[in-house]
């Protein structure tokens, strides 16, 4: 019988297999940040162990980093301590670190791919659930806990139970104005936040194949929001073109050999998945969340659902609780929901294509009165590229705040937070209660919807904008 993409990569990395025990996998790339690594390094110190493979380990600062005044001391003592601890640990153990202010600093899941560290057929781990992002390259990538971080640092291996596989096939072409973020939000709403539990998801089909690498990263990034262990997309010419010439990509004959191997990383025709889901791309539309988990979403053209419409008691209760927290009413049109803040950034949508898309919509327009718009590049390198294209000027002229790289408002661990009761349209990946700050209310959206929302002041898509939203040039 043939094998799926996930099975091929898994089998290639098994160091030891024994009946009744988890497989022991070799890890090709270990990414670190300041939040989940301190106890792991402490464990190494206590046991007197070094980092096993410094050449396969890299760290960056992202979760706690400020996005303003990065040359000044960090005010919050916890954030400052975590960053200082990471710097000391990396110095003590010889781990490569890209700290705040470094040209390669940024959100770990943006930094890895842009450096060419993430490659097809590799295993990638990080103490962060959105490590699934790297599966866009045909890598087997998953988040791990702190004790597992220590295990990988010490041994470059990890014992893991083999997950099941699920194919998510997206047939046809995405309609105009529908993005990768809309697609993954629709998938999560379809299968639920627990629908992928115990599975590695493989995204397939015409719509997936036509996505750029950055769009594919958005898809795989949110696999964890469907409960999955990982998400993967088979590598192809789009993948190879993205990787070629990047700092850590193979060169010359090594490149040719790598591409030949990468081309084998496709699910065999006779392979069998444990589960399959089919999505019709033509039926999709701009999508937003209305509740407090990523599965509570609907097309922007819809209304807030009535909890009474849910047959399942637990779903009904969750919807009731979500509406109470979000301050919404059943039947309320999603487009009528006013926002206070718009956030463009994160490891989901903080790449250059995302910033270009948002900038194109706010160009020659103004952010609505009473709305605050934060634009945060996913890495310092992305920020430099955006500046070279003049995108920072576009955002600032529209009235948005242009920031330095970091996780920013994706989570309430740095100064960029919502105040209690404030509502945001956010391109990040989670909308749990308090995720963006205590009492904050989050609607997950695409960069395009975020930008249109910033201009109109309520949830909106670019199609809702008209020529009337463009200021008349002086003297005309």
UniProtKB/Swiss-Prot annotation:
Gene3D superfamilies in the record: Aconitase, domain 3 (3.30.499.10)
Cofactor note: Binds 1 [4Fe-4S] cluster per subunit.
Keywords (A to Z) from UniProt: 4Fe-4S, Amino-acid biosynthesis, Branched-chain amino acid biosynthesis, Iron, Iron-sulfur, Leucine biosynthesis, Lyase, Metal-binding
Cofactor(s) this protein cannot do without: [4Fe-4S] cluster
Stored InterPro entries: 3-IsopropMal_deHydase_lsu, Acnase/IPM_dHydase_lsu_aba_1/3, Acoase/IPM_deHydtase_lsu_aba, Aconitase_4Fe-4S_BS, Aconitase_4Fe-4S_dom, IPM_dehydratase_rel_enz, IPMI_cat
GO MF entries: 3-isopropylmalate dehydratase activity; 4 iron, 4 sulfur cluster binding; metal ion binding
Chain intervals for the UniProt region annotation (Disordered): 418-442
Keyword Iron: yes
EC number(s) stated in the UniProt entry for this protein: 4.2.1.33
GO terms (BP aspect): L-leucine biosynthetic process
Broadest EC class assigned to this enzyme: lyase
Known pathway: Amino-acid biosynthesis; L-leucine biosynthesis; L-leucine from 3-methyl-2-oxobutanoate: step 2/4
Residues that bind [4Fe-4S] cluster: 347, 407, 410
Highest taxon in the source lineage: Bacteria
Subunit structure: Heterodimer of LeuC and LeuD.
PANTHER family named among the record's database cross-references: 3-ISOPROPYLMALATE DEHYDRATASE, HOMOACONITASE, MITOCHONDRIAL-RELATED
Protein family according to the UniProt entry: Belongs to the aconitase/IPM isomerase family. LeuC type 1 subfamily.
Role: Catalyzes the isomerization between 2-isopropylmalate and 3-isopropylmalate, via the formation of 2-isopropylmaleate.
Protein name as it appears in the record: 3-isopropylmalate dehydratase large subunit
Name of encoding gene: leuC
């Amino acid at each position: 019988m043939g094998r799926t993409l996930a099975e091929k990569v898994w089998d290639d990395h098994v160091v030891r297999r024994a009946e009744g025990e988890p497989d022991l996998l070799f890890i090709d790339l270990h990414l670190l940040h300041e939040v989940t690594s301190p106890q792991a390094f402490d464990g190494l110190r206590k046991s007197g162990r070094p980092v096993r493979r410094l050449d396969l380990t890299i760290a960056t600062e992202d979760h706690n980093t400020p996005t303003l005044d990065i040359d000044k001391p960090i005010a919050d003592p916890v954030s400052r301590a975590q960053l200082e601890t990471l710097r000391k640990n990396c110095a003590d153990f010889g781990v490569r670190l890209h700290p705040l202010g470094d040209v390669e600093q940024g959100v770990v899941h943006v930094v890895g791919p842009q450096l060419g560290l993430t490659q097809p057929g590799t295993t990638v781990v990080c103490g962060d659930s959105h490590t699934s992002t790297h599966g866009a390259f045909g890598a087997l990538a998953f988040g791990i806990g702190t004790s597992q971080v220590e295990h990988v640092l010490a041994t470059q291996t990890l014992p893991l139970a083999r997950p099941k596989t699920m194919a998510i096939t997206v047939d046809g072409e995405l309609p105009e104005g529908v993005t990768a973020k809309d697609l993954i939000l629709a998938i999560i709403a379809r299968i639920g936040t627990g629908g992928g539990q115990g599975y590695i998801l493989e995204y397939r089909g015409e719509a997936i194949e036509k996505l750029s690498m950055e769009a594919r990263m958005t898809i795989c990034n949110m696999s964890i929001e469907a409960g999955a262990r990982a998400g993967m997309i088979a590598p192809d010419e789009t993948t190879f073109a993205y990787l070629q010439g990047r700092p850590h990509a193979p060169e010359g004959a090594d490149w040719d050999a790598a591409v030949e191997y990468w081309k084998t990383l496709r699910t065999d025709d006779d392979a069998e998945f444990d589960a399959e889901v089919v999505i019709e791309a033509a039926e999709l539309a701009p999508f937003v969340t209305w509740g407090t988990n990523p599965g509570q979403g609907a097309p922007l053209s819809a209304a807030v659902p009535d909890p009474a419409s849910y047959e399942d008691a637990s779903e009904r209760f969750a919807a009731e609780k979500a509406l109470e927290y979000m301050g919404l009413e059943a039947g309320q049109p999603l487009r009528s929901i006013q926002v206070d803040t718009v956030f463009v950034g994160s490891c989901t949508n903080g790449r250059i294509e995302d910033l270009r898309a948002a900038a194109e919509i706010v160009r020659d327009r103004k952010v609505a009165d009473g709305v605050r718009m934060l634009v945060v590049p996913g890495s310092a390198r992305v920020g430099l590229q955006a500046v070279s294209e003049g995108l920072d000027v576009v955002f600032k002229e529209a009235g948005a705040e242009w920031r330095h790289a970091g996780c920013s408002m994706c989570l309430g661990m740095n100064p960029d937070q919502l105040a209690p009761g404030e509502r945001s349209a956010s391109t990040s990946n989670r909308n749990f209660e308090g995720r963006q700050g205590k009492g904050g209310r989050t609607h997950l959206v695409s960069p395009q919807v975020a930008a249109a929302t910033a201009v109109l002041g309520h949830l909106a898509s670019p199609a809702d904008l008209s020529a009337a939203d463009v200021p008349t040039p002086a003297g005309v």
